[in-house]
Amino acid sequence: MNKLISIIIPCHNCSATIVDCWNSIKEQTIGLRSLEIILVDDASDDQNVTWNALSKIEASAPDSVIIIHLDENVRQGGARNAAFPYIHGKYFMFVDADDTIEPDSCEKLYYTAEAADADMVLFNCTYRDHNGNSIPRVIYKEHQTLDLSNDTIRRQTLLGNGLTYGCWDKLYRTEFYRSVGSFFPEHVIYEEPLFVYPLFFYATRIEILPEYLYNYYIHANSTVTEYALQHRGDHPAVQFLLLSWLKKHTDIFSKYYEEITFYIVWSAFIETLVFTKNDPESDTAYPFYEYIRSILIAEFPDYSKNHYIRSLGYAEIFAYLEQPIETQEALKNLRSLIKKANL
C-alpha cells in the first residue's frame, strides 16, 4: 500500500516517552497502514534501552516502521536529516519522541492538503505537562488558504506575521520539499529555521488549519533551560547559516532583500537577547552580543533604512547596532530597553 504520510521521529535516550508517542501514532484514524514511521536512534547511550524499545515497535508493525541507528550523536536536526532519504509518503511531518499527536491528526492533515493541493499545512498545538495541565498555543484562529503566487502574501510570510518557523507544527508535501532541498544544521539545539524558512520562498499554496493536532510536553527539568543557556550561541549561529544559504540563492536574496534583512536582524539580535534574558551571565556576556552586532552590521550596513525595522518603533533598541557593545553597562542598558518594550 502506498504511504500517505511519513512521520519522522528523532530518538535519543527516549525509552520513557517513546511508547506514548508511538501509541498516539498507531491509533491514528487514517489507519497505520497508510503511515510510514521513521525512528532515528541518535546514538543513544543508555545501554541499548532505547534501541530495544524501537526494535519492539518495528517488530509490531514491520510494514509501517523503519528504524535507523546513528553512530554519532548529531542532535535532532541531524537525526531528521538522516531520515529524509527513507521517506516514501506523499507527505511527511515531524514528531518529537516525548510528544504525541491527536488521533485524527494525520487524517485531517492529509485531506486538507489534498483538497487544496497544498505544499504545506500549518496547525496549532497544545502545551501539556505530565500533571495533566494544558495550555493551547493559539497561533491560527481560522482556516485560511495562503496563495503565495501573490507576492504581497509571500512577503508577509517571510516576516513571520502570524506564522511560526518551527518544524513540528506543519505537514510537508514530499515532492515540494525535495525541489527546495533545505536541511537542518547538526549538533545544535535551535535547528529549525534553516530547514523551514527557505520553504516559504518556494511554496505556492499553504493551508492554515486552526486545530490543535500536536501535543507538546513541557518538562519541569531545570537542566533543559540550563543546557539551552549553555548553548546560547546556537540561536544566532543558525540564523547566520541561514543567511549563508540565502546568499547562495541570489535570485531570492536580491528579490526579498528587505524581508531577509528584517528577519535576520530581528532573529539574530533581538530574539537572542529575549531568549537569554534569564541568563545568569547576562550582564557579563557583552562580547557575545558584540560579536553578533559586528556580523549584522557587516552583512546589512544599510539595515537602518529597512522600512520594516523603521516601522516597528524600537529605535532605541536598534540604535545599539550602531555602536560597539563593549561594556557591561552597555549590555545592561540594552537589556533594560528590551524589558521596557515587553519583548
What is each of the regions a protein language model found here?
Residues 211-220, 226-253, 271-300:
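Catalytic core of nucleotide-sugar-dependent glycosyltransferases
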Residues 117-118, 277-343:
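Membrane-interface aromatic/basic loop that binds lipid-linked glycans or pyrophosphate carriers
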Residues 92:
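Short aromatic/hydrophobic "clamp" motif used to bind/position activated sugar donors
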Residues 22-69:
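Acidic donor-binding segment of Leloir-type glycosyltransferases
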Residues 97-207, 217-230:
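Donor-binding/catalytic cores of nucleotide-activated saccharide
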Residues 69-87:
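Glycine-rich, basic loop-to-helix element that forms the pyrophosphate-binding segment
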Residues 3-6, 24, 36, 194:
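Cell-envelope/extracellular polymer assembly enzymes that use nucleotide-activated donors
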